[in-house]
Design a protein with these regions (language model features):
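Conserved acidic
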Residues: 19, 50, 135
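Intrinsically disordered, low-complexity regions enriched in Pro/Ser/Thr/Gly and acidic residues
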Residues: 93-171
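N-terminal single-pass transmembrane signal-anchor helix
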Residues: 2-31
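Edge beta-strands of extracellular beta-sandwich domains
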Residues: 188-193
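Short, exposed beta-strand-loop hairpins at the edges of beta-sheets
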Residues: 176-183
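Extracytoplasmic beta-strand-rich oligomerization domains located immediately C-terminal to a leader/signal peptide
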Residues: 26-128
């Protein structure tokens, strides 16, 4: 009797290669799906972080309002808080001065919405000089609309501030901010003001 030769037949090799190819494809798809999911989570997390940072910055500015009127580049007296046509200009306190320099703790802050970007500019110089223009930095992207409503002393929500006939140091009682965010819908925040 002749002994059988040891080894695999061509058919057995093809079946083994096919099984290996199927397992490799499944493993690749699993890893690829996990990486795509991780990228999506990372993008969402970055957007949430940016949103929280923008809200915290805005909240810090708005909750430290100071009733100090300012002067524009022509020397005309302007209210401490001006909100019109999607733009906001305010004076806030609380600027740190750890070295105790002889300066105020007040800051002039401006916000605006331009091409889907919520922008902020801050300046320690409250009264503008001719040619001064604030330098804006983007704090949040993907904002299709920003609506600011101010609660006056009579309990009415107003789109513009200050109301007609109000003194320059007049401040509202509360603020309602609505952002329309691309892909997320409407976000609304309210603050009781000092």
């Amino acid at each position: 009797m002749k002994g059988r030769s040891a080894g695999f037949t061509l058919l057995e090799l093809l079946v083994a290669m096919m099984v290996f190819a199927v397992l490799a494809t499944l493993a690749y798809q699993g890893i690829s799906g996990a990486l795509r999911a991780q990228e999506g989570v990372t993008e969402t997390q970055a957007r949430w972080t940016a949103l929280q940072r923008a809200q915290a910055l805005f909240a810090r500015d708005i909750t430290q309002l100071a009733p100090r009127p300012v002067r524009d580049a022509r020397g005309d007296r302007q209210p401490a808080l001006v909100a019109r046509s999607g733009q906001l200009s305010l004076v806030r306190g609380g600027m740190p001065n750890p070295l105790d320099f002889p300066r105020s703790d007040l800051v002039r802050v401006n916000y605006r919405l331009v091409d889907g970007r919520w922008q902020r500019a801050a300046s320690p110089v409250l009264d503008a000089a001719p040619g001064d223009a604030p330098e804006f930095a983007t704090v949040l992207t993907g904002v299709s609309r920003a609506e600011l409503l101010w609660l006056d002393d009579e309990g009415r929500w107003r789109g513009d501030w200050p109301p007609p006939g109000a003194p320059p140091e007049a401040l509202p009682r509360a603020l309602r901010l609505r952002w329309e965010l691309a892909g997320w819908g409407t976000l609304e925040r309210r603050w009781v003001l000092p």
